[in-house]
Amino acid sequence: MIYLALWGLCLGLTAVCWRLGGVPERRAAGMMLAAYALSVLLGGVRIEGLKVAVVTADVLLASGFLWLAMTWRRWWLLFAAANALLVVIAHISVFLEPSIHQRAYIAYRMLPGLAIPLAAGLGAWERWLAGERTPGGWLRRSAS
């Protein structure tokens, strides 16, 4: 039950990024949605207790956030990139020391993993509070 609530929170914050955010927020939302989809659809394959798709998604997400943080001047991108790197470090530590208990591994990944969409949502909200216009809508509007 808690797991579903956390997934709902992450998806809701991703939707906030898409709806209220600018270009970097929307790119981050797209990257997070792609990482969620990869983790869910291909999450069953394991090597040494690690889910290969989850590790791959987290490494790609960290790389994407590092790229966004170096490209755009937004405070939340640095915070999200740092937390994404912490998630990757969690994967590396479990790979190097397989005796780490599974619940400790999940807890080690959970807090930084939840901080990523939270930071993105706060960044989009801050942009909205500042009165900045969002880029073009989801669908093109008719010229009538």
Label the predicted regions.
Residues 7-13, 60-70, 114-126:
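Hydrophobic cores of alpha-helical transmembrane segments in multi-pass inner/ER membrane proteins
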Residues 60-64, 80-95:
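Hydrophobic alpha-helical membrane segments
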Residues 1-44:
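N-terminal signal-anchor transmembrane alpha-helix
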Residues 1-8, 48-59, 107-113:
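Structural signature of hydrophobic alpha-helical transmembrane segments
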Residues 43-52, 71-74, 99-104:
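Membrane-interface helix caps and helix-loop-helix hairpins in membrane proteins
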